[in-house]
Amino acid sequence: MADVIKRCILGPTEAGWFVAKSQIKKPVDQRPVILTHCKLHSKMLEPKAIVYKKNSSAIPKRVDNILLRSQKPKHIECLLVDSKITKTRSLLKRFGSCLDETSTIVLLNQSVSLWEDCYSLFPKTETRPRIYLGRFQTLFKSFPFNLISDSFSYRLNLSKLPRTPLEKCTVARACKQFPLNQRSPLLDLMGSFERDYVNFSNFSQMLSAQLCDSMAFLIQIFPTPLLRQKAANAWIEVLSKLPYFHILDKSFFSPHLLLQSSENQACKFFNIGPQVYFDPRERLLHVKELLKFALKHIDSNDSLFTFLKQTCYTCDSPYAKVFQPDKQSFHSIISRKRLAHLEKEYFDKDVSKLVL
């Protein structure tokens, strides 16, 4: 089974629903494969990925398992990484031997912290696959759902990640087109995508837009204009410390724009649906991911650190026990054990309401 896999999606079971509907006229063997991580109940068991394909009724069908240590595809031409998948980094590492300079990876609506790690996931420049950021945009929906599974009106923006680390880039050039030998596999994998619906964006602009959306999302948790203004200023200071700040589009990063984005519209880059705004657990997971990104670039003297510390001392909120006065406690939000404790203790409360 593993030997015939050329194009596949790393994602949850439902990730291929839209793909299946668009390719229902094709023979089953020609439809894309869904690989999802299998939870292990024992550390002694060999990790495996569950293989799903589509039958004639477009219902996910479990057809096989792949043992990730002993069974792997020989070569993967095109790999789409859905933002809903878990264990993303470990899966990419395990499939690293199946990917080379002729392979293409499309990171669909992924967080900044994942593609920042791509250079360490694929350390050899000469064999590093082509890596693209894929950003879905809905045309008619007010909330951007997980596009690969349940959107009918969409547009896919692609931007190529530079082959050299971002801090060494002098300029982020525009990606004018997908390589001809890889574009067809991508469109075929995505089903009914037409060429007119695939745009090629300047990497600098796409990265800047994603960072802007990320900041706007975290600013939303604060209840008053004054707190949101302070949060916006603190995040702009974080951005100025990024080693690749020189290639960003500075027009995205103004306090006015961040505040406007956080108040008037949902974030466009993440797969954020209404459930995130009403589910405290989803909100906390997104906040954790953004802080994980920020903590790489700030120290205890920075405004964001001070702002979060002061805010949580004055706010009657579950976040107050997450953001402690020392940086080591900031890191605790990232640890699995600490997050599990928060889930148990606080997720029955409304963490979106911060009261001064």
Swiss-Prot record:
Subcellular location: Mitochondrion
Keywords annotated in UniProt: Mitochondrion, Translation regulation
One GO CC annotation: cytoplasm
Phenotypic effect of disruption: Decreases mitochondrial respiratory chain complex III assembly. Decreases RNA level of cytochrome b cob1 and may lead to abnormal folding of cob1 protein. Abolishes growth on the non-fermentable carbon source galactose.
GO BP: mitochondrial translational initiation
GO MF entries: translation activator activity; translation regulator activity
Function of the protein: Translation factor for cob1/cytochrome b; plays a role in cob1 mRNA stabilization and required for correct folding of the protein.
Subunit structure: Component of a complex, at least composed of cbp7 and cbp8.
Name the UniProt record assigns to this protein: Cytochrome b translation regulator cbp7
Organism whose genome encodes this protein: Schizosaccharomyces pombe (strain 972 / ATCC 24843) (Fission yeast)
